[in-house]
């Protein structure tokens, strides 16, 4: 039987990334740029979300060679993505020794009915969520870290803003509920009752919740921190920009000093062009990655 890590240990690893930026990278060179810029971790994958979106087809776990090259190149934690419900991809990444697995809607889901039972793994997991129902279901399955789904690969922050605001509003609503109301809310959200009780008692989610999906500028990163994010994932925004090293450093600084508007103004000067963005309303239903999972 596989050894499993305790929730406290897994969640503690996520807490250590709090306030930081996690960057998508596709090779060792990009990983080094991210580390030098101050990233707290990197996400190793074959293609950034913008390229996955452009290429279409089936997106799978990265070649293990890429993951190992990134792991050997940097001293910061390395994450990697597995398809939703793909037990073997997750086990392979665990065997490779990654620090975290992202059960990710950016990749093509392997199972449209079941997410991974993350409690059975030693390695901790991060999962996306759009609302408190999705957040608590992922936590109940064993996720040690959450992130907004946003709309990956678009360079458009609007969906990440929507998801962060919704989760936070629903947490505030739960905190003000009686136990009787909590049971009904658990039914309405499809959320485990005991988890809602814990959220009511603590006044917050039991795991960290990062912003992800559409972060393209230092101002975007600062905005998400102001809305209550515990940190920021940047997928396509850095290495699809004109000056990745400068963009990476600027986003890290803006995430740390998210209320220092003069600094953010300076960081935003002469960065070059940000990644080309996509208007969400122009996406076809099958192109909306955030709809994947349940």
From Swiss-Prot:
The active site is at 81 (schiff-base intermediate with d-ribose 5-phosphate). Its EC number is 4.3.3.6. GO terms for biological process: amino acid metabolic process; pyridoxal phosphate biosynthetic process; pyridoxine biosynthetic process. It is an enzyme of class 4 (lyase). Gene3D superfamilies: Aldolase class I. CDD domains: pdxS. The keyword Lyase applies. Keywords: Lyase, Pyridoxal phosphate, Schiff base. Pathway: Cofactor biosynthesis; pyridoxal 5'-phosphate biosynthesis. It catalyses: aldehydo-D-ribose 5-phosphate + D-glyceraldehyde 3-phosphate + L-glutamine = pyridoxal 5'-phosphate + L-glutamate + phosphate + 3 H2O + H(+). InterPro entries: Aldolase_TIM, PdxS/SNZ, PdxS/SNZ_N, RibuloseP-bd_barrel. D-ribose 5-phosphate binds at residues 24, 153, 214, 235-236. Catalyzes the formation of pyridoxal 5'-phosphate from ribose 5-phosphate (RBP), glyceraldehyde 3-phosphate (G3P) and ammonia. The ammonia is provided by the PdxT subunit. Can also use ribulose 5-phosphate and dihydroxyacetone phosphate as substrates, resulting from enzyme-catalyzed isomerization of RBP and G3P, respectively. This is Pyridoxal 5'-phosphate synthase subunit PdxS. It comes from Bacillus licheniformis (strain ATCC 14580 / DSM 13 / JCM 2505 / CCUG 7422 / NBRC 12200 / NCIMB 9375 / NCTC 10341 / NRRL NRS-1264 / Gibson 46). The gene is pdxS.
């Amino acid at each position: 039987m596989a050894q499993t890590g305790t929730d406290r240990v897994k969640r503690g690893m996520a807490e250590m990334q709090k306030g930081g930026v996690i960057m998508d990278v596709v090779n060792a060179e990009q990983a080094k740029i991210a580390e030098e810029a101050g990233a707290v971790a990197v996400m190793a994958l074959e293609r950034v979300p913008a390229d996955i979106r452009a290429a279409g087809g089936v997106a799978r776990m990265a070649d293990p060679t890429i993951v190992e090259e990134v792991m050997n190149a940097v001293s910061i934690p390395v994450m990697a993505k597995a398809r939703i419900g793909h037990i073997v991809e997750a086990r392979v990444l665990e065997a490779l020794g990654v620090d975290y697995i992202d059960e990710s809607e950016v990749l093509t889901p392997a199972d449209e009915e079941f997410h991974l039972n993350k409690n059975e793994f030693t390695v901790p997991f991060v999962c996306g969520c759009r609302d408190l129902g999705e957040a608590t279901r992922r936590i109940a399955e064993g996720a040690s870290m959450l992130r907004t789904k946003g709309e990956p690969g678009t360079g458009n922050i609007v969906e990440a803003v929507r998801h962060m605001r919704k989760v936070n509003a629903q947490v505030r609503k739960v905190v003000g509920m009686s136990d009787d109301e909590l049971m009904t809310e658990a039914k309405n959200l499809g959320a485990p009752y005991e988890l809602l009780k814990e959220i009511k008692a603590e006044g917050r989610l039991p795991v960290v919740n990062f912003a992800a999906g559409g972060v393209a500028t230092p101002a975007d990163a600062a905005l998400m921190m102001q809305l209550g994010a515990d940190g920021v994932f940047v997928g396509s925004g850095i290495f699809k920009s004109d000056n990745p090293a400068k963009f990476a450093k600027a986003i890290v600084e803006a995430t740390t000093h998210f209320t220092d508007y003069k600094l953010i103004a300076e960081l935003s000067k002469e960065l070059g062009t940000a990644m080309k963005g996509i208007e969400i309303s122009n996406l076809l239903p099958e192109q909306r990655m955030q709809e994947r999972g349940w």
